[in-house]
């Protein structure tokens, strides 16, 4: 049984650390010169396939992921520490799509690693800004922002456990207790008309369980929901045969058990080769002596028998434990790969480009990003940026395009006013 599980997340590479603006000051050393160190690089963000994960459940509540920022540089030419990379674990078989560039990567092997957001470069300290004509720079570079990506993750889910039972055996109630599924529950046959998917989570592991439409006698001949139901069962890895132990549905427990086993055998004998557990449900409606009789009655029928009550929750934790035990051997044993890939962002324009956007003039490109490295709230940085703007003749180009005095120009992420 295959379902589609999806999630949308935002990932951020760590910001690079700011460079330091400092000067060497030691006794007996005159004009020690600039000694500000560079900032550390921001951490990268990777997606890594992990065969132990089966669903995208972990992304239901956490949508944003951010790698660690680089540390700022310090005096005495000390470089800041690089930020730690962030590794996000995903199930094998996830298709990763960049929502902006439409780049698609199929993560179909265990151990694959995909770089989805690079960390920003650390800013240069003033020790590295010195030149032959600028021997004592009082400014430094700010750290670069890390890349940001909006990603869509899509996983085709195979239901690992199929709940098999006659109508009104309590499958829907049971799946609502052991998972967060919300099936329609009512006291009449065939309440469930299509498969209901639930995700059962235990510690850091999870598996997918499906409550499929109720079985009736003659299903293998197409009666009731018949062949549709049995096709769903065929694709699961583990069967959980759910029986109404209180016989409210009119079938005595042993009669119900033999009916279900008979239908599975008639449709495909291989279904009985699957790992399975017998679930005797609704025990809250039984007297203790009746429960003991059921234990004896089914002791030699199945190696795994669990007595549960979806109404009170009794036995449901034991059921989850048994299902995990049965599922573990069926999980992928494929050898992990060391394959590494990078999801590239489109390159920035070589120098810079100018466009009008609402009330602003926007300057983009590599040069614009370069300008954003400087802290224009500091006088020395501001003077340097002004010199760069004049060198590029940006103001002249803006006026030629119709820019007027008093209008705002945004260079990457910094705003200036045309004078």
From Swiss-Prot:
Highest taxon in the source lineage: Bacteria
GO BP annotation list: ribosome biogenesis
Ranges where the OBG-type G domain occurs: 159-328
The entry's keywords: Cytoplasm, GTP-binding, Hydrolase, Magnesium, Metal-binding, Nucleotide-binding
Cofactor(s) listed: Mg(2+)
Binding site residues for Mg(2+): 172, 192
Matching InterPro entries: G_OBG, GTP-bd, GTP-bd_Obg/CgtA, GTP-bd_prot_GTP1/OBG_C_sf, GTP1-OBG_CS, GTP1_OBG_dom, GTP1_OBG_dom_sf, OBG_GTPase
GO molecular function, one term: GTP binding
One Pfam family recorded for the sequence: GTP1_OBG
Binding site for GTP: 165-172, 190-194, 211-214, 281-284, 309-311
PROSITE patterns listed in its UniProt record: G_OBG, GTP1_OBG, OBG, OCT
Domain Obg: 1-158
EC top class named in words: hydrolase
Entry EC no(s): 3.6.5.-
Gene Ontology cellular-component annotations: cytoplasm
Record's function text: An essential GTPase which binds GTP, GDP and possibly (p)ppGpp with moderate affinity, with high nucleotide exchange rates and a fairly low GTP hydrolysis rate. Plays a role in control of the cell cycle, stress response, ribosome biogenesis and in those bacteria that undergo differentiation, in morphogenesis control.
Quaternary structure and partners: Monomer.
Family membership: Belongs to the TRAFAC class OBG-HflX-like GTPase superfamily. OBG GTPase family.
Protein name per the record: GTPase Obg
Recorded name of the encoding gene: obg
